[in-house]
């Protein structure tokens, strides 16, 4: 097996101490030019590559930002990641992306991994409303910013849209189009986003003088296309089928759309569908979906920039207002 070249090998080849090699790498201005040239020549000749990660861990910090999302199969979170990665790269950082797959167990494991790797900070979309994993993560004193989730307390930072207003916008559109029987394909009830969008939908009905019974909820365990197809099948089985559907995200809406096509139901003639997120796939569907837009790339970039502000404030030992 080939020997991995270390700093001691460089020192031996250059005829200097390990400390001198370290100074050439980290503080070259403190080393005489002749000695510095000899060390650099040895580095080139031996092909030495310093262990940046080890150096950073010894210093108690990393140039990696953690990003934990609900579902990397959702184009919304792909766009969030793009925005976060761009902002991190501009700051000289990399991004470690992990997917909780909407599992609190996997979320806990990845947060533990981030702590073990001593990441600079974490961007996180929580899996549920309880915040148990977040509470456990706080003890590591690693800065974090919530993405697509409103912070509950005053000590946390978050980047999100107003999901109550978004839910109201979607249902107001359907009510204005004359619909008086609307289904809400909601997703997991533990997600704040799902609950807030439902609250907004009910607010829109109240504004229109309509009762809550106008909205019929069809919960799903996940926020993906397969769950949308299942909800669509349940919708088709209703005796008094609603004339419109509001879906908690676009993947659910695409699944409902597929179920309707398979059953010969015309969209939007027989059933109107409104999604949420305005992902590119929704606009490219056989029947382009109406959707509430979320600026995912911008949200990711803003969250990363906010996290960098948090880490800088922590390094400077000063309070940071947000």
For the regions a language model picked out, list residue spans one by one.
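Short beta-strand segments enriched in small/hydrophobic residues
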Residues: 18-22, 57-73, 173, 181-188
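Hinge/beta->alpha junction and helix N-cap segments in small-molecule ligand-binding domains
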Residues: 52, 69-79, 97-106, 132, ...
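Periplasmic-binding protein-like
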Residues: 67, 118-126, 183-186, 218, ...
